[in-house]
Amino acid sequence: EAVFAFAERMNEKAIEIGAVNSHFSNPDGYFSPDHYTTTSDMLKIAKEALKYDNLRETFKKRKVTYKITSGQTMTFNNSNRLLNPSNPYYFEGATGMKTGYTTESGHCVIASAKRNGVEIIAVIMGGTTSNGRWADAVALLEDAFALHELTAPTTAVPAA
């Protein structure tokens, strides 16, 4: 019942933010025939999630410990290699967000990074290898930041 209620609310929110090519049937992202999305919709959802400071802070942590209602604590390790300075895929300025893998969807990541006040989000889905997902994320982020620098507005200079 809780899973159904979550999915119903998630689908409503997705439509509200313009993620109209998705349908969610569970909160964990595992395969279900009626659970699907697109890279474009995931970008919209990621942008929405980053509006919430508590989520933004959680996404960038390498480890999070929560106290659950029973009083027990649970620790979650973030598998985002872009956040780990000792990993070859470390990305300076990485801020999160979410990794995933299923046989059906392949290796996926929503990767965010911020440099010089500019935040970029890259969405990779359907990767054939875990390392490939990280290499693609780094390449997309590097290219996006380089493109932004090339096209960033400059200070106007008076005409002679």
Report residues per predicted region.
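Penicillin-recognizing serine hydrolase domain
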Residues: 1-159
